[in-house]
Amino acid sequence: MERPSSSLVLAKAIRLKNKQAIWCGSLTKRTCLWMGGTYRNGWIDANIKELGSYKIQQDTKAPVITPINQQTWVSKQNFIFRLSDNLSGVQTYRGEIDGQFVLFEMNNKSVITYRFDKERLQRGKHELKLIVTDACGNESIYTHPFTW
């Protein structure tokens, strides 16, 4: 089994406000694939497995949270969202109702669903909160008041 080698890439020319947002990407014919990396003292430290062309980029855009079928959420007793991020990818998501954690299920790579838990969720007014973070630490927060 091969172990990835570590490569240091000079990145002093990039002016950074958020050093966590910097990352290294592997260039292919059509795109730049996210590989991660850590900014340390003006250098990017990233694990690479093969020689090739790489690019240093900065991800400062927060993930996108898109509600799906919002008009039927209460009647169908579930919340559905599509999560996306244009560069480093979605790393974590957390759902809350009235400040309490609720478990969202990942249906596929980008769609999550919460089905109302009738034992924990009482009838009345509530607030849903969804927090999504990408691999560079950018965060989006979606809130939605609802009555059930």
Where does each model-flagged region fall?
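Short, solvent-exposed loop/linker segments at the N-terminal edge
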Residues: 70-76
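Exposed aromatic-hydrophobic patches
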Residues: 5-12, 41-49, 113-119
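Exposed beta-strand face motif in extracellular beta-rich ectodomains
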Residues: 52, 77, 124-128
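Proteolytic processing hotspots in large secreted/extracellular or virion-associated proteins
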Residues: 1-22
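Long, low-complexity serine/threonine/glycine- and acidic-rich segments characteristic of extracellular
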Residues: 86-148
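Short edge beta-strand/loop segments characteristic of extracellular beta-sandwich folds
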Residues: 7-11, 78-86
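Surface-exposed loop/turn motifs at beta-strand-loop junctions within extracellular Ig-like
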Residues: 50, 60, 132-136
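Proline-centered linker/hinge motifs at extracellular inter-domain junctions
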Residues: 60-64, 126
